[in-house]
Amino acid sequence: MIQAFTRLNVADNTGAKEVMCIKVLGGSKRRYAQVGDVIIASVKKATPTAKVKKGKVVKAVIVRTAKEIHRENGSLIRFDDNAAVILDDKREPIGTRIFGPIAREVRYSGFMKIVSLAPEVV
């Protein structure tokens, strides 16, 4: 579960290393976000040659959470970290590579480009 002020790793090659959640999109009083949800985030750490500079406010989709995900078949899945992929205004990923596994729930949310770039979908 991701909420305001949660820090997430960035799982793409935009050059940003860490983002902080500012707002969870999808309702006026929505507090928590899970895998596949879009958030508004601020870039907190970035490399000097990054496409996205430190301090920039961006949209991102969550691809991994440390909080377990309950699936319809009764199984649970959780990851070691919280991670997101930075999006542009058209909800397409800015980066051209995705690092690490991503959850299958990202596909159900309609981010097929991210799923096709990912090395592993769990």
From Swiss-Prot:
The keyword rRNA-binding applies. Disulfide bonds: none annotated. The keyword Nucleus does not apply. GO terms for molecular function: large ribosomal subunit rRNA binding; structural constituent of ribosome. Pfam families: Ribosomal_L14 (PF00238). Belongs to the universal ribosomal protein uL14 family. HAMAP family: Ribosomal_uL14 (MF_01367). Binds to 23S rRNA. Forms part of two intersubunit bridges in the 70S ribosome. PANTHER family: 50S/60S RIBOSOMAL PROTEIN L14/L23, LARGE RIBOSOMAL SUBUNIT PROTEIN UL14M. This is Large ribosomal subunit protein uL14. The lineage of its organism: Bacteria, Pseudomonadati, Campylobacterota, Epsilonproteobacteria, Campylobacterales. The gene is rplN.
